[in-house]
């Protein structure tokens, strides 16, 4: 989070940071409880704050006309990095220093760092919303906030301490709900009812058609489904199925599909192939309506749904030029 530069569209934007290799452990002869052991990992120009300032300036410069702003915070992704003065509010946590023997960078107070990184984003969003109000355009501005995937222990993230996933199974890189299920918040005064909620299930490929719908532009038919009707509590089209796959560098290949049966039950099928075992993996099946935390595999009870899941998995993808990312080795 202290890179040497950022990109603003096509413009290269230098930061006042010396290069810091992102994966280096604390030397084994260093004292992890000595603050001086971490001095070499510190930098000054925090990228998240630069992003926030750029967003604020953009809004000020475009407040007289409709605008689109995509603001992508990298935090709280590893490494654990935050300006020192923002740690103070969380230094009461009981801590074990993270020495980064596995990955990313060490930190003397990893729990405080992660909490402060999240609070930094919270503060930034608050500043953006306050500016919209000051400029008198908050009532005309739709704000959508979401994230990309579930939590991970990489880089010293303590998922158990923060209860990052609640009851959901899996983490980042898993295709269980804990890896891919993310809440999405939307605020649009006078258009979206405050405090309302929707059970509509969308995926990131629905964002572009939603934005196109807002702009009055027709999106290509292969780019998902607009969820604008769900935001406005109108009749919403739904996906007949949603498909995911993930290829781990450690030789694990995962597929998942979510679909409905004739009774409108929401099902989720997950298949994980491990190159090291070379076995034909079982497809797990979960009834997400009664088992949203994916605790009970009911694949043996519904063989017809397993066949349907296999067909959707095969039909939902095209071949990759990287052979390892195909699933030719699996029977239909």
Task: Please tell me what each predicted stretch does.
Residues 172-177, 243-249, 254-256:
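Short Gly/Pro-enriched turn/cap motifs at secondary-structure boundaries
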Residues 309-331:
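Charge-dense polyanion-binding interfaces
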Residues 1-205, 212-222, 271-280, 289-295, ...:
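Active-site-proximal cap/lid insertion segments
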Residues 186, 209-213, 228-232, 255, ...:
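Generic alpha-helical structural context detector
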Residues 133, 232-239:
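Basic phosphate/pyrophosphate-binding loop/patch that engages nucleotide-derived ligands
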Residues 58, 253-275:
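Short, surface-exposed beta-strand/loop micro-motifs that present aromatic residues
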């Amino acid at each position: 989070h202290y890179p040497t530069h950022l990109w603003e569209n096509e413009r290269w934007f230098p930061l006042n940071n010396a290069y810091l290799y992102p994966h280096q452990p604390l030397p084994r002869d260093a004292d992890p409880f000595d603050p001086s052991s971490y001095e070499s990992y510190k930098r000054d120009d925090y990228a998240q704050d630069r992003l926030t300032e750029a967003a604020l300036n953009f809004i000020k410069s475009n407040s007289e006309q409709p605008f689109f702003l995509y603001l992508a915070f990298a935090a709280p992704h590893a490494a654990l990095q935050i300006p020192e003065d923002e740690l103070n509010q969380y230094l009461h946590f009981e801590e074990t220093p993270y020495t980064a023997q596995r990955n990313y960078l060490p930190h003397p107070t990893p729990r405080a760092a992660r909490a402060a990184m999240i609070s930094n984003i919270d503060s930034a969003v608050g500043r953006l919303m306050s500016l919209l109000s000051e400029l008198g355009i908050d009532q005309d501005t739709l704000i959508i906030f979401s994230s990309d995937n579930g939590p991970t222990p990489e880089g010293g993230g303590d998922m158990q301490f923060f209860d990052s996933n609640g009851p959901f199974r899996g983490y980042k890189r898993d295709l269980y709900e804990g890896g891919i299920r993310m809440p999405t918040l939307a605020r649009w005064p006078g258009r979206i009812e405050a405090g309302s909620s929707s059970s509509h299930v969308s995926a990131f490929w629905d964002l572009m058609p939603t934005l196109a719908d807002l702009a009055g532009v027709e999106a290509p038919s292969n780019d998902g489904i607009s969820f604008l009707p769900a935001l406005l509590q109108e009749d919403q089209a739904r996906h007949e199925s949603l498909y995911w796959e993930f290829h781990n560098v450690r030789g694990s290949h995962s597929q998942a599909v979510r679909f409905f049966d004739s009774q409108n039950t929401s099902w989720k099928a997950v298949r994980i192939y491990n190159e090291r075992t070379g076995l034909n993996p079982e497809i797990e099946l979960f009834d997400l309506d009664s088992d949203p935390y994916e605790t009970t595999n009911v694949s043996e009870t519904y063989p017809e749904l397993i066949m349907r899941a296999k067909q959707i998995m095969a039909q939902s993808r095209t071949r990759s030029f990287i052979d390892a990312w195909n699933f030719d080795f699996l029977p239909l």
